[in-house]
Amino acid sequence: MLTDSDKKLVLQVWEKVIRHPDCGAEALERLFTTYPQTKTYFPHFDLHHGSDQVRNHGKKVLAALGNAVKSLGNLSQALSDLSDLHAYNLRVDPVNFKLLAQCFHVVLATHLGNDYTPEAHAAFDKFLSAVCTVLAEKYR
């Protein structure tokens, strides 16, 4: 559960994230490189570095996270449709959400540098863990 302090840190981090609109695509590229088995969920995508399809999907990832940041008090409702899509239509193994979250942390650390303090990292990790949990809810 996110404390008020965590929520404040998440909002502060997010204000910096939105200055880097390619963070989502970078996280996806890192995901595909580090965990190549995740490519199986994107058979119709050009997965090469700089691909328009990866860049566009990265924008969708960032938009979904932005929606979650705006709805920190009710993530389940904010992410319900996305959870349905991934569970029932796309049938994405929920472990992949955690893998993407790890990749997102690396991208944030790369772009934010010293602004991604241990406290900010811990709060954002709680946030991403909560997002992963909500996205996996429909699998039960």
Swiss-Prot record:
Pfam families: Globin. GO terms for cellular component: blood microparticle; haptoglobin-hemoglobin complex; hemoglobin complex. One of its GO terms (biological process) is hydrogen peroxide catabolic process. Residues 1-140 form the Globin domain. CDD domains: Hb-alpha-like (cd08927). Involved in oxygen transport from the lung to the various peripheral tissues. PANTHER family: HEMOGLOBIN FAMILY MEMBER, HEMOGLOBIN SUBUNIT ZETA. This is Hemoglobin subunit alpha-D. It comes from Columba livia (Rock dove). The gene is HBAD.
